[in-house]
Amino acid sequence: MVLNHSHIVRLYLIKVMCQLLGMNCNTPTDIVFSFEGFRRRAGLTDCHSDGFGIAFFEGRGVRIFRDNQAASLSPIADCIKQYNIKSLNVIAHIRKATQGEVNIENTHPFIREIWGQNWVFAHNGNLKNLPDMTDHFLQPIGSTDSEAAFCYMAEYLKNTFRKKPSEMEIFEAIQKVTKGLAQHGTFNFILSNGEWMIAHCSTNLHYVMRKAPFGKAHRIDDDGVIDFSYYAKAGDKVNIITTFPLTKNESWTKMENGGFVFFKNGEKIAEVIGTPKEAIDDGTLGNRTINSAI
C-alpha cells in the first residue's frame, strides 16, 4: 500500500515497541534530515526513550554510536548532526524496552561477524520462548530477545553455508530462519552487511525511494523542511526504511506482515509481498498517532 498526501487521511492510535530507521543508497549520503525527525520520537513526539543507537558502514568497517539515554536528549545523538557522516548503509534504532534492562549492552543496533564481514541488526518487537542457545557458539552479550534472535540467525547462516553464498541464497536463507523466529512474536527488523540492506515486517514498516526529480520533503515530527534538489545529483538513489513515515508529502509504501525487501545501491532488487494482518496489542507501550490512508 502506498501512502501519500492525495489520500483521504484519518488519525488513529497505534501501539508499538521500538522504532527502526534504515538508509540504503548508491552514493555516500548523510541521514541527518531523517534522523533529526526520528530522534524526536524518543521522548518528544513519542515515548521510545530507553536508549538509541546508529551504525554507519564505511567500507568494510562500521562506525557505531550507542547511548542508554533518550535520543532526543543525548549529546551523542547531537554528534550525528554535527559530524554529518555519509554512508551507503545506515541502521538506527530508538528503544522502548520490553525485555532486558536499560543499559548499553541492550541497546541496538547489534553487530556480529559473518563470513568475514560486519553484519548490523536492529529489531522492533517482542519475542518469547526463543530456542535455547546455551550450547551455541554465538552468544548474546546483553539480555534482550532481539540480540538472542540475531545470534540465532547468524549461527543458522554460518551453519548453512561454510563460505559466503550468493546474495539471493542469503536472502532466501534469511526468509527461512525469519519465518521460524517470527513464530515467537513480533519480528520487524533491518539487517545489513554494508553491501545491501534487508528489511522484514511483522506489523509496521514503511519505505520511500528517493530519486530524480528531487523536491522538498516535510517532516512529520517537527515540520522540518529540506529541498533535496539542492543536495542530490541526477543519478542519486536513496531508500529510507522506518517504522512509521517520517515525512508527510512523500509516497511511502507500507509493508505487510511477512513481507521482505532487499535493497542494494539504492535499488529494490527483490521483494516478498506480505499479507495484510490486523495488529495485535501484546501489552507493550508506545503510542503513536500518525496519518494513514483509508
From Swiss-Prot:
* An MF annotation (GO) of this entry: transferase activity
Instruction: Write the protein's name.
Output: Putative glutamine amidotransferase HI_1037
UniProt keywords (A-Z) are: Glutamine amidotransferase, Transferase
The organism that produces this protein has a lineage beginning with:
Bacteria, Pseudomonadati, Pseudomonadota, Gammaproteobacteria, Pasteurellales
Residues annotated as transmembrane: none
Annotated Glutamine amidotransferase type-2 domain residues? 18-266
Q: What is its EC number?
A: 2.4.2.-
Taxonomic superkingdom: Bacteria
Q: Name the catalytic site residues.
A: C18
Q: Which InterPro entries match?
A: EgtC-like, GATase_2_dom, Ntn_hydrolases_N
Please report the organism this UniProt entry assigns to the protein: Haemophilus influenzae (strain ATCC 51907 / DSM 11121 / KW20 / Rd)
